């Protein structure tokens, strides 16, 4: 009998402190306090509906990975994240080596909060750094500064997570090749097990789409990618997807399940 593919779960948290001008995800700037308990309750109802729809028995399939994305999931308290994961596990068992990733904004993270997320079951944090240059962060609408980004990476090292990722963008408005590579050097110096190195793209229904900034031309973009790829390779990172680089053994299992045509459920709005 053929074994079923891995099963993963994506959980969406739609709130942010403010909407970034390049973001085309379903995310919304906070206008009042997040209704945490009500939203977690709704997520569980959403999961129950999927379980019934697909006929998933509690011990029939075990979850291989969970990814909590957004939005800014780190706006949700560790206690509510823990309650959410407990309710999920009551319904679908977890593999012993399950990867549970949560996205975090450096501007919403404190030392105790990282540790509390780990205690509640988070095994991997994805930190949305995007750039270490203050002017670029401002252009991107980010709420954090370079110091907060560096601090978040150091905290992730210190709390004993299985892994963590830094999100870094290149091809930013008016960015030179040197600036892009300096950003990458700073990220590599922080020695994350995983680096997601994305080129900025302008998507419909974003502020950047309605008011396009000046981006590097194709020649500069190629130089950034070519030289940056060499830097990452020399630093021991292996490219395993278009924008994903990791140290050996630290690939994002959730992403790999997508690329390998595994099964997944998605809940949230």
Language-model features: locations:
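Local cysteine-cluster metal-coordination motifs and their immediate loop/turn environment
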Residues: 14-27
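Conserved N-terminal Rossmann-fold NAD(P)-binding element of oxidoreductases
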Residues: 11
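C-terminal scaffold of the Radical SAM
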Residues: 3-8, 27-56, 61-269
